[in-house]
Amino acid sequence: MACGENERASTSPPNRAAAARGGRLTLLDGCCVALVLALTAWSGFFVYRMQGGARTLDIRCGAQRWTYPLDQERVIRVRGPLGETEIEIRAGAARVCRSPCANGTCIAHPPVQRVGEWNACLPNGVFLYVHGTDAAEPEADAVQ
């Protein structure tokens, strides 16, 4: 094996653009790096800004609408066409405690606490929906 063969096999072809610049960054390289850093900071700002937002419970009955924070415990009574529906907010979640409906599906429903969750007493026309920004617990949008 000759020395020249070994040397040729271990070296890569010359990069003429890098050689012409002398291995230095150009103005365009600096702009690309600055753009990537700016986009990273911008996206991080929006991701962290949305975390830990206040969640509220939106209750609707007919044309009436009420909004309550989920971090304050209380019992709410809403009068619907069939009678009074009782809603309890406790430990950051809301549930229907009592309702005059015959089937009681709204009472059996688990408490709503995450943004986008809802419950309804259809016979009495009472709807509960959780609003806010809660990116702390992202979930896949799928049927479970």
UniProtKB/Swiss-Prot annotation:
Keywords: Membrane, Transmembrane, Transmembrane helix. It is a single-pass membrane protein. The keyword Transferase does not apply. Its main location: membrane. Pfam families: NusG_II. The keyword Transmembrane applies. GO terms for cellular component: membrane. It is found in: Membrane. The chain crosses the membrane at residues 25-47. This is Uncharacterized protein TP_1032. The lineage of its organism: Bacteria, Pseudomonadati, Spirochaetota, Spirochaetia, Spirochaetales.
